[in-house]
């Protein structure tokens, strides 16, 4: 089959250093592009578990494209990665893990999912539609201060207070149920002099991250990755905005440096760091950005487990 080629594909394949007989986890299956690349590099005894909390990503028709005895596809969030690995008896044996964080292209392109401010659809934004709270439910009942806090904390939106007030004012007239309605509210609330990109970009990002617990799940997943990897195993994390990357960077720093106070008399050679960063932050090439403009904000960090 001809698989979709995802962002930073070549860099991820190189970063995972795939062994033909290795065990790998793709924590964000999506369209299956990274998983397909891993399978191409595995031998007959290699194994891959692909996870995704979006039921559309792990739908039967998608699984049919990946009929392969070496692959198991699991409908589950990567926040439960350790349990899924443990259920297979792989804990401490995994040679590589990939996390490609954030919303996928199919989710953005499907207006019915409600992720995009450029396509009118129901204001949903749930990556897993079985989840109870959607964006419209929250927007129409949250206190103004809670909306402001979400827009600031998860979107770093400078005009969070103005937008939150505009949302509350608008919903007093009628419930906000469509993506276009929310987008129009944000546009009207935004100072014209500040419009350099679409005014709703940060608002939609913030609400999506909040509704899907994206940062919480990433925070829960990273320590699990460390525990499930074998010594010498690799972790590759692709993020698309500073909030995610900052969280990943801090985790790597925490696990790759000395935590002991300087006054404790232990030699540097006796300190056991758990992770080693491999190279610096990787960004897509200009050629890739030209082919796929969405790749522009992608960032890849690669680490290896030492102990």
From Swiss-Prot:
GO annotation, cellular component aspect: cytoplasm
Q: Care to name a GO molecular-function term for this sequence? A: rRNA (cytosine-N4-)-methyltransferase activity
Report whether rRNA processing shows up as a keyword of the record: yes
Pfam families assigned:
Methyltransf_5
Q: Which reaction does it catalyse?
A: cytidine(1402) in 16S rRNA + S-adenosyl-L-methionine = N(4)-methylcytidine(1402) in 16S rRNA + S-adenosyl-L-homocysteine + H(+)
- Enzyme class, one word? transferase
Q: Where does S-adenosyl-L-methionine bind?
A: 32-34, 52, 78, 100, 107
User: What are the BP-aspect GO terms?
Assistant: rRNA base methylation
Annotated InterPro entries: RsmH, SAM-dep_MeTrfase_MraW_recog, SAM-dependent_MTases_sf
Q: Which UniProt keywords apply?
A: Cytoplasm, Methyltransferase, rRNA processing, S-adenosyl-L-methionine, Transferase
| Origin: domain of life | Bacteria
Predominant location category? cytoplasm
Subcellular locations according to the entry: Cytoplasm
Entry EC number(s): 2.1.1.199
Q: Which NCBIfam families match?
A: 16S rRNA (cytosine(1402)-N(4))-methyltransferase RsmH (TIGR00006)
Q: Which PANTHER family match?
A: 12S RRNA N4-METHYLCYTIDINE METHYLTRANSFERASE (PTHR11265:SF0), S-ADENOSYL-METHYLTRANSFERASE MRAW (PTHR11265)
Its function, per the record, reads: Specifically methylates the N4 position of cytidine in position 1402 (C1402) of 16S rRNA.
**Which protein family is it in?**
Belongs to the methyltransferase superfamily. RsmH family.
- The name this protein goes by in its record: Ribosomal RNA small subunit methyltransferase H
Source organism: Coxiella burnetii (strain CbuG_Q212) (Coxiella burnetii (strain Q212))
Source organism phylogeny: Bacteria, Pseudomonadati, Pseudomonadota, Gammaproteobacteria, Legionellales
């Amino acid at each position: 089959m001809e698989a979709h080629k995802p962002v930073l594909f070549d860099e991820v394949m190189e970063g995972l250093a795939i062994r033909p007989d290795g065990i790998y986890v793709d924590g964000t299956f999506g369209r299956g592009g990274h998983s397909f690349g891993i399978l191409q590099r595995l031998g007959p005894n290699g194994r891959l578990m692909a996870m995704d909390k979006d039921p559309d990503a792990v739908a039967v028709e998608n699984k049919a494209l990946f009929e392969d005895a070496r692959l198991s596809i699991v409908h589950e969030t990567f926040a439960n990665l350790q349990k899924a690995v443990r259920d297979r008896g792989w804990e401490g044996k995994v040679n590589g893990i990939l996390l490609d964080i954030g919303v996928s292209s199919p989710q953005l392109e499907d207006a019915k999912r409600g992720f995009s401010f450029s396509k009118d659809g129901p204001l949903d934004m749930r990556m897993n539609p079985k989840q109870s709270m959607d964006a419209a439910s929250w927007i129409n009942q949250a206190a103004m201060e809670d909306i402001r806090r979400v827009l600031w904390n998860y979107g770093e939106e400078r005009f969070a207070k103005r937008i939150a007030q505009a949302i509350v004012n608008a919903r007093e007239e009628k419930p906000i149920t469509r993506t276009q309605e929310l987008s129009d509210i944000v546009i009207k609330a935004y100072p014209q002099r500040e419009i350099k990109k679409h005014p709703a970009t940060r608002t939609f990002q913030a609400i999506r991250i909040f509704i899907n617990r994206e940062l919480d799940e990433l925070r829960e997943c990273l320590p699990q990755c460390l525990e499930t990897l074998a010594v010498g195993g690799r972790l590759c994390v692709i993020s698309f905005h500073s909030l995610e990357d900052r969280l990943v960077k801090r985790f790597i720093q925490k696990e790759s440096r000395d935590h002991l106070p300087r006054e404790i008399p232990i030699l540097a050679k006796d300190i056991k760091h758990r992770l080693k960063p491999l190279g610096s932050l990787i960004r897509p090439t200009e050629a890739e950005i030209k082919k796929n403009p969405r790749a522009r904000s992608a960032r890849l960090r690669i680490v290896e487990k030492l102990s």
